[in-house]
Amino acid sequence: MKILVYGAGVLGCNLARNLFHAGKDVTLLARGNWAEEIRKNGLRIKDQFSLRTSVSRIPVVTTLAPDAAYDVIFVVLRYTQLDSVLDTLRTNRTKNIVFVGNNVQARALAAALPEKNVLFAFALSAGHREPDRVVSIDLKKITIGQLRGAVSNAELIGEIFGGTKYKVVYELNMEDYLLCHAAFVMPAAFACYKTDGDLKKLRRNTVYLGRVIDANIEGYRAIRNAGHDILPKADADFESEKYRKTCLRFFKLMCATSLGKLCASDHAMNAIDEMSALNRDIKQFFDENGAAYPVWQALEAEAGRYLR
């Protein structure tokens, strides 16, 4: 099975490295100085919480030609970059396309590629890229699947990830999963912008963290009331006191440790365009469905000098 990972940021590099180490025939599409660095010195990934740095001699390309044949292409780009690659994907012969990352317009994106088998995924890794390496935490867990009602891709996913160290969650309704993910991460991004990327400023601010949870609940309520599922299923009881307590513990941990920088503020501060677009599009979803989200709007206003 030939696999292309299209995009060499933190998520793409971790995905390519993990597939490569499992013996998969994987190629990484990178650009500019970063492509040359990988070609010359290998893909270097430093684990944030250990002294270990892996070096992987992964084949690198800089373009996707129409006749380049792969069994699957993982598109690992920012939400704001996806439209720019659609023509390239349309003209390429590969049928199976997996979009990895934030997305609140999954159904529209799949409709834009009617001749393809379009899947979506979200991988649990985070960090930042330096000139000669990636520094990250990689939990080796990926949620992947198609839109509700689409043909099953269980066999394909099993073939891709068989023999890897990934914990794979096969999700039959990735549209709703990604909507819910956006409703969770955007309030956290507002917190990053409020503190100029230093979440430790909020470690004792339980009132503000409570508002972050309130905004998340507003988002989930809007999604549920519009007829969508709350996913993962563990979040279905999002209006319960148990859910609030679990979220508060999580956000306090994020604000008190380096996890906040690595898992939230690094990306939020370096991907303001993506977070702005994600916020814009999920608010459009809220408005189209007549949802009220006053706490969300208040947090957004406090982060306004960053959002575009």
Mark where each language-model region is.
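N-terminal glycine-rich dinucleotide-binding loop that anchors FAD/FMN and/or NAD(P) in oxidoreductases
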Residues: 43-60, 185
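Rossmann-fold dinucleotide-binding core
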Residues: 105-183, 187
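Hydrophobic anchor at the start of a short beta-strand
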Residues: 3, 25-26, 97, 118, ...
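Rossmann-like NAD(P)(H) cofactor-binding subdomain of soluble oxidoreductases
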Residues: 52-135
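Helix-loop-beta segment of a Rossmann-like dinucleotide-binding subdomain
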Residues: 133-143, 193-203, 258-269
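Active-site-proximal catalytic alpha-helix in oxidoreductases
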Residues: 175-203, 207-220
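NAD(P)-dependent Rossmann-like dehydrogenase/reductase catalytic/cofactor-binding core
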Residues: 217-220, 224-308
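NAD(P)+-binding Rossmann beta1-loop-alpha1 motif at the extreme N-terminus of oxidoreductases
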Residues: 1-51
